[in-house]
């Protein structure tokens, strides 16, 4: 067995053991103090959980999608190994077209409407 395979095996085994132990130990003896929310030593006034807007989550996912698309399309002409610039332009246009179709679909379905 090569040195690299030995290192990868030991790393994977150690990571798996540590992950299992970290999930297993807290279930053995849950502490009431650690399970309660902390508010400067006082009893909590209400729930520590706040409601999360699903529309905000959808807008955030769309932002990340288009941000990633821009990050991938900007260096495309320099990093592309396609034979002609026209082929690069065609692929970039196809990606933009598919993303535009997805945006139009979200718009028609009402996913971009913030207030109801």
Swiss-Prot record:
One of its GO terms (cellular component) is NADH dehydrogenase complex. It is found in: Mitochondrion membrane. Signal peptide: none annotated. GO terms for molecular function: NADH dehydrogenase (ubiquinone) activity. The keyword Transcription regulation does not apply. It catalyses: a ubiquinone + NADH + 5 H(+)(in) = a ubiquinol + NAD(+) + 4 H(+)(out). The chain crosses the membrane at residues 3-23, 56-76, 85-105. It comes from the Eukaryota. It is a multi-pass membrane protein. Its main location: mitochondrion. Its EC number is 7.1.1.2. Keywords: Electron transport, Membrane, Mitochondrion, NAD, Respiratory chain, Translocase, Transmembrane, Transmembrane helix, Transport, Ubiquinone. It is an enzyme of class 7 (translocase). Core subunit of the mitochondrial membrane respiratory chain NADH dehydrogenase (Complex I) that is believed to belong to the minimal assembly required for catalysis. Complex I functions in the transfer of electrons from NADH to the respiratory chain. The immediate electron acceptor for the enzyme is believed to be ubiquinone. Belongs to the complex I subunit 3 family. This is NADH-ubiquinone oxidoreductase chain 3. It comes from Paralichthys olivaceus (Bastard halibut).
């Amino acid at each position: 067995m090569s040195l690299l395979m030995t290192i990868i095996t030991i790393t994977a085994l150690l990571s798996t053991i540590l992950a299992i132990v970290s999930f297993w130990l807290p279930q053995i003896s849950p502490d009431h103090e650690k399970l309660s929310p902390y508010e400067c030593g006082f009893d909590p006034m209400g729930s520590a959980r706040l409601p999360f807007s699903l529309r905000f989550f959808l807008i955030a996912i769309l932002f990340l999608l288009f941000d990633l698309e821009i990050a991938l399309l900007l260096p495309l002409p320099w990093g592309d190994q396609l034979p002609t610039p026209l082929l690069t332009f065609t692929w970039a246009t196809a990606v933009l077209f598919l993303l535009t179709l997805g945006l139009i679909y979200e718009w028609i379905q009402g996913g971009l409407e913030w207030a109801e």
